[in-house]
């Protein structure tokens, strides 16, 4: 019953992404004028760290969809506030949160390492909007991990845990939109 709601929420999220992709993208558009040999990749971006960095960030962002789905399903379920139900959805949410946070950590670390040695900014972090777009879900994910532990062990912060699970995924979406839409430039 509860897992069906979780899968339903994930299905709605996936369907939303499908609709967005269909509405905004056309893989059959032609480039005018056509690039004879292609435009090649910027030499700064031809690096091993950047082969791994974007997929790690992506897996971290997408991984937060599962705790989000559990939180929304818990809000929709009347029995979700019972101690047994809370313990169950916390037990299922925690591994997904840890994995998503781990991927996001690796992605941020690789991006910082690349920026340090390739761009020579003189540091690992420059407070660039692109960096902060991945840092905000990471901070909320860190708070979510600790809130999950407190809720699991002492039964406190239930509402806070739900809010953090929703915020982690929402900030992942917002950060992706801001960085990839061209609203913010780095």
PLM-predicted stretches and their roles:
Residues 1-186:
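Polytopic transmembrane helical bundles with strong interfacial aromatic enrichment
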């Amino acid at each position: 019953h509860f897992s069906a709601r979780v899968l339903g929420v994930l299905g709605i999220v996936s369907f939303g992404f499908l609709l967005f992709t269909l509405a905004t993208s056309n893989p059959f558009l032609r480039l005018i004028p056509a690039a004879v040999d292609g435009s090649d990749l910027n030499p700064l971006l031809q690096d091993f760290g950047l082969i791994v960095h974007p997929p790690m960030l992506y897996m971290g962002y997408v991984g937060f969809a599962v705790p989000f789905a559990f939180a929304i399903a818990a809000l929709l379920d009347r029995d979700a506030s019972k101690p047994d139900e809370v313990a169950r959805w916390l037990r299922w949410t925690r591994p997904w949160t840890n994995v998503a946070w781990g991927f996001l950590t690796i992605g941020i670390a690789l991006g910082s390492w690349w920026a340090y040695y390739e761009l020579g900014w003189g540091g690992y972090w420059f407070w660039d909007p692109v960096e902060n777009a991945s840092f905000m879900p990471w901070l909320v994910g860190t708070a979510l991990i600790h809130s999950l532990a407190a809720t699991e062990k002492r039964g406190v912060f239930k509402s806070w845990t739900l809010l953090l699970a929703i915020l982690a995924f929402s900030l992942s979406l917002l950060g992706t939109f801001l960085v990839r839409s061209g609203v913010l430039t780095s």
